[in-house]
Amino acid sequence: MKILILHQHFNTPETGGAIRSYYLAKALVDSGMKVVVITAHNEKKYKKEITEGIEVHYLSVAYNNRFGFVARSWSFLKYVKGVIRLAGQFKDFNYCYAISVPLTVGLAAQWIKSRYKIPYIFEVGDLWPDAPIQMEFVNNYFFSEALYLLEKSIYKSAHSVVALSPAIQSAIEKKVSGKKVHLIPNMADCEFYKPERKDPTLEERFQVQNKFVVSYIGAVGVANGLDYFLECANAARKAELPLHFFICGDGALVDRLKKNAQQLSLANLTFLDFTNRNGVQELLNVTDASFTCYKQVPILETGSPNKFFDGLAAGKLIVINFGGWIKNEIEENQCGIYCNPQQPTDFVKKITPFLHEQELLSRYQAASRHLAEKKYSRKQLSAEFAAIFSSPI
């Protein structure tokens, strides 16, 4: 079995960032399949590498989390063009697996299906174009309708669809009746991230001795709504709680958030540069609560953020400020707290019991790890993913 994976933002454990597509590719390789990934990088020349049995082709297509909507769109289309040029090398492959976002990767998958008769499976991590429309990046009615037509066309011509959350699965099933939609959420790497005692050396390096640590690890963009995270840090400062906050990542709003934090005199907040998963592991070692934050836009509640699953695997108290399926999950499993996004003082109210009751904190943290092992372990979901390709074409 030969599988061609299209993912513009493919990362490895060494490079850092979201590595779901690496996990998926590795699962297929471990199942005895040949796997080729077409991705992109910011270097000026095309490059080919073999990474743990995965053949990776890097197209020269610049992309940065700080890009605006137009620059991102141009990058997405340039990637599609590059895939089409390269795809002829793999015309004897059995399946194409196209990973969005962006939605436009579906154009490349459709072209490969039409030209080489290779069926494709389409992965949906965020509902496009709903997300950019609800966030008002796309305001033109006719452009919006064109994007919706493209979305439906991509789903309809796919062999099947993989959804990263129950909410996304439900939405696609409504949009394209009768289409097979698999549910393969993001994965908790329970072998790499584990509950562990805080390392005094790391506590000293991060300067958080005797502190309750709340960490946000991930993209720092408009969708992440991190103004609320700063408001929580400010509310904790005013309440004189022994908390320290971290924002670890990169994105369009980093500089503005740093400026705002300085204006608020948030000595209890530290910004850390984007890092690979070894760096994330070190930060999680000293972390008590893992914070997942979103701007208050309904469609964002359907997502499947990596940081949530890393926090579960590491056995951390989960803190969120949005509703939807993740809110239901943490409340049903008693492993996290939901904080009112309009009231930062609600965070102070709900986090305070965990500062004074170690048994309560330990119970919630253990429940996080249990949920990761029971429902979201990389081993379990990798097997479910590989099984998709054993079905007849």
Sequence positions of predicted segments:
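Conserved donor-binding/catalytic core segment of Leloir-type glycosyltransferases
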Residues: Q207-A233, Q365
